[in-house]
Design a protein with these regions (language model features):
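Short, acidic/charged, Gly/Pro-enriched secondary-structure junctions
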Residues: 60-88
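Helix-start/capping segments and mature chain N-termini
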Residues: 1-66, 90-254
Length: 254
């Protein structure tokens, strides 16, 4: 079904309250990349908010594959969403949850951004229940809009204690004296993030805003973008302002 023809109730809690969880995946050569890891996180998010997924894992996989084939997609961006459904104004348990699968062609940022790096800004805001992937995205939206206003590509969220947590749509990494580090707490643990931590033995730790000038390299990670170098933060160079050697190595390996 075409997206513009799909409808939901105006009383759906996902629409009214952002009372929903979701997961974004991608395909590589027609196969769903890191499917098990994504579904595990989807199940975890649903459990936290008290939602029961109406399909088994294999059924979801088959539905995704069928949708990809029907749309003749090889490189696709997939999103699955589960809301509490139409419960009128009652905040009680879900009676008729809404489950949705979307698939569309995956488009990557220009190659130049991977070669020269992107710019980021910092934005002081905190995302509640950061450990789950919920459709209540207002903090991330505000952060990204601020980045756009400043003509940057991404925003790094900073909490009230001056800690860098994550990007508006990504996880963040830094390199300091040859060691890869990444924020440990108050984040959504990305699937690509886990791969990077395993490959680089990255240290999960507290990263303070005041420590940004000390960083030699920076990059972000996400399912749809992969690894993307960050060469400027708040208008200032990261290291020498070029994509660093460790980031380059990761780009060639993932």
């Amino acid at each position: 079904m075409e997206g513009k023809k799909a409808v939901i109730s105006v009383t759906d809690h996902g629409f009214l309250y952002g009372d929903a969880v979701y997961e974004t995946m991608r395909t590589v050569d027609g196969k769903v990349w890191l499917f098990d890891e994504h579904i595990k996180r989807f199940e975890s998010s649903a459990k936290v908010v008290g939602l029961k997924i109406p399909y088994k894992k294999i059924e979801i996989y088959d539905q995704i594959v069928s949708l990809i084939k029907k749309n003749r997609l090889t490189e696709a961006r997939i999103r699955i969403t589960l809301s509490r459904g139409s419960n009128e104004l009652d905040f009680g348990p879900a009676k008729n949850p809404t489950f949705l699968i979307e698939a569309k062609k995956l488009t990557f940022p220009p190659k130049e951004l991977y070669e020269k790096g992107i710019s980021a800004v910092t934005f002081e805001i905190e995302r509640p229940m950061a450990q789950i992937k919920t459709t209540s995205m207002l903090p991330s939206i505000l952060a990204y809009q601020y980045a756009t206003k400043k003509k940057a590509h991404e925003a790094f969220l900073v909490d009230h204690r001056g800690r860098i947590t994550e990007g508006s749509m990504s996880n963040v990494f830094f390199v300091r004296r040859g060691k890869v580090i990444t924020p440990k707490k108050y984040i959504l643990e990305g699937t690509v993030r886990k791969l990077i931590i395993k490959q680089t033995r990255a240290k999960q730790t507290t990263v303070k805003y005041r420590d940004l000038p000390k960083m030699d390299e920076a990059f972000i990670s996400s399912t749809t973008k992969g690894i993307m170098p960050v060469t400027r933060i708040n208008g200032k160079k990261v290291g020498d302002g070029k994509v660093g050697p460790i980031t380059k190595k990761l780009l060639s390996n993932l």
